[in-house]
Swiss-Prot record:
Region feature Disordered, mapped onto this chain: 1-20
Organism: Aeromonas salmonicida (strain A449)
Coiled-coil features, chain-numbered ranges: none
Family membership noted in the UniProt record: Belongs to the bacterial ribosomal protein bL27 family.
This protein's UniProt keywords: Ribonucleoprotein, Ribosomal protein
Disulfide bridge map: none
InterPro entries: Ribosomal_bL27, Ribosomal_bL27_CS
Gene Ontology MF: a single term: structural constituent of ribosome
Protein name: Large ribosomal subunit protein bL27
Transmembrane segments: none
Pfam families named in the record: Ribosomal_L27
One annotated GO biological process: translation
Gene name in the database record: rpmA
Length: 85
């Protein structure tokens, strides 16, 4: 009976592909309607004025304007809004 495992049988070598999440457009930037602002898992950022929430929690601009990030409410939630120009 062999006392050493045969070579070439590593059980490592798998990893998931990066999902490219995060903020795509920053505060003060001008965006067009339909632009993706944040890609996220869950609602780290909440949708404010003129911002829509996709089925995968992606935030996108519903109107053309400047992005405004703000913290408000009793739970100090982060909101993303679009100020129309």
């Amino acid at each position: 009976m062999a006392h050493k495992k045969a070579g070439g049988s590593s059980r490592n070598g798998r990893d998931s592909e990066a999902k490219r999440l995060g903020v795509k457009r920053f505060g003060g930037e001008t965006v067009l309607a339909g632009s993706i602002i944040v890609r996220q898992r869950g609602t780290k950022f909440h949708a404010g004025t003129n911002v829509g929430l996709g089925t995968d929690h992606t935030l996108y601009a519903k109107a053309t304007g400047k992005i405004l990030f703000e913290v408000k409410g009793p739970l100090n939630r982060k909101y993303v809004s679009i100020v129309a120009e």
